[in-house]
């Protein structure tokens, strides 16, 4: 499986972040073809205190080809263009990963 993860840094204006995430990021993400799962995490802290991140979003696809195909759609292009200014202003970190899960 392949994942696309976005980590939102803590910001002074949390309202703008929440509005962007709820009204833009999440609806576009959920509209991507081939999307298998979405995991959203509200960061509560880290082992040594407060984290610099506030929100994590992980989208899972069957494989890299499925992720690339999804991002090449009109919805995928709009999503990436919406996220780009956040990345350029260092308000998010984002990456793709070849991932696996193990059930215990």
Listing of model-derived features with the role each one plays in the protein:
Residues 1-104:
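Macromolecular interaction modules
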């Amino acid at each position: 499986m392949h994942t696309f993860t976005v980590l939102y840094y803590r910001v002074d204006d949390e309202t703008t972040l929440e509005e962007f995430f709820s009204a833009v990021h999440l609806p576009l993400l959920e509209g991507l073809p081939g999307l298998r799962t979405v995991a959203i995490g509200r960061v509560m802290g880290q082992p040594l205190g407060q984290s610099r991140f506030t929100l994590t979003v992980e989208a899972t696809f069957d494989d890299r080809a499925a992720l690339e195909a999804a991002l090449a759609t009109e919805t995928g292009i709009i999503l990436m263009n919406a996220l780009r200014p956040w990345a350029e202003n260092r308000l998010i970190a984002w990456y793709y990963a070849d991932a696996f899960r193990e059930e215990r």
